[in-house]
């Protein structure tokens, strides 16, 4: 059977970055504002400037804490099922950091939680756009037409433009956005959608 691929963002899709960052920020004396769950920008979530928020995100992403993030929702179970039962391999495309130690911690974190599911981990600069890397991946024959999972609508669209099949992981900050792709509340939704398409019975419903 030919190998099947899922290209995926990590933070907010596979790993619960928000939980880890929230604990780290609280430890450093920062508090979330009311209604934070509906805001994507970290500065707005903590009542600070965009620049200050971005600086703290980079600091967190390059700290030891980044190697110990928990799985998001039911990701651990269904990623393993897709890999072990249905022969899917995963490629991580994450705007984490260019720091090599951060990449090593991310790779170890994923392996500890997801076993051998991830074939490759691609780390971009903190908060970087993914357009160029998605275009490059689309030109690699084995990845052509793969699934593409994101929580940021703009990145989902960038992948769809390269022929990937988009799935948006729903959060408070994106739940009212219109996207070109399936919207999932958890990995069980993703699993059911992917397997349904494998069987030719896929339905596109929000």
Describe each PLM feature range:
Residues 1-52:
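Active-site neighborhood of HAD-like aspartate-dependent phosphohydrolases
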Residues 15-17, 23, 90, 99-103, ...:
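Short catalytic/ligand-binding loop motif for oxyanion handling, primarily in non-cytosolic enzymes
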Residues 26, 83-84, 160:
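Anion (oxyanion) recognition and catalysis
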Residues 31-32, 39-80, 86:
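Metal-dependent phosphoesterase signature
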Residues 66-71, 75-110:
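Substrate-recognition element of Asp-dependent hydrolases with the DxDx(T/V) motif
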Residues 93-147, 153-156:
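Substrate-recognition "cap/lid" segment bordering the active-site pocket of phosphatases
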Residues 122-126, 181-193:
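Short acidic-hydrophobic, aromatic-tinged amphipathic segments that line or gate anion-handling sites
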Residues 143, 147-185:
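Acidic, Mg2+-coordinating phosphoryl-transfer loop and its flanking beta/alpha structural elements
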């Amino acid at each position: 059977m030919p190998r099947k691929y899922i290209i995926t963002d990590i933070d907010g899709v596979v790993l619960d970055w928000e939980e880890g960052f929230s604990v780290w920020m609280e430890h450093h004396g920062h508090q979330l504002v009311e209604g934070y769950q509906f805001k994507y920008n970290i500065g707005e979530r903590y009542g600070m400037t965009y620049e200050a928020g971005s600086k703290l995100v980079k600091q967190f992403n390059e700290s030891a804490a980044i190697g110990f993030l928990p799985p998001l929702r039911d990701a651990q179970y269904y990623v393993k099922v897709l890999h072990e039962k249905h022969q899917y391999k995963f490629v991580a495309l994450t705007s984490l950091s260019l720091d090599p130690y951060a990449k090593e911690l991310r790779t170890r974190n994923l392996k500890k939680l997801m076993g051998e599911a991830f074939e490759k981990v691609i780390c971009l600069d903190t908060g970087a756009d993914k357009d160029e890397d998605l275009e490059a991946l689309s030109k690699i024959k084995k990845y052509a037409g793969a699934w593409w999972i994101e929580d940021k609508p703009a990145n989902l669209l960038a992948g769809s433009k390269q022929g990937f099949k988009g799935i948006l992981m729903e959060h408070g900050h994106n739940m009212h956005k219109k996207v070109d792709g399936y919207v999932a509340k958890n990995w069980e939704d993703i699993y059911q959608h992917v397997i349904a398409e494998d069987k030719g019975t896929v339905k596109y419903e929000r």
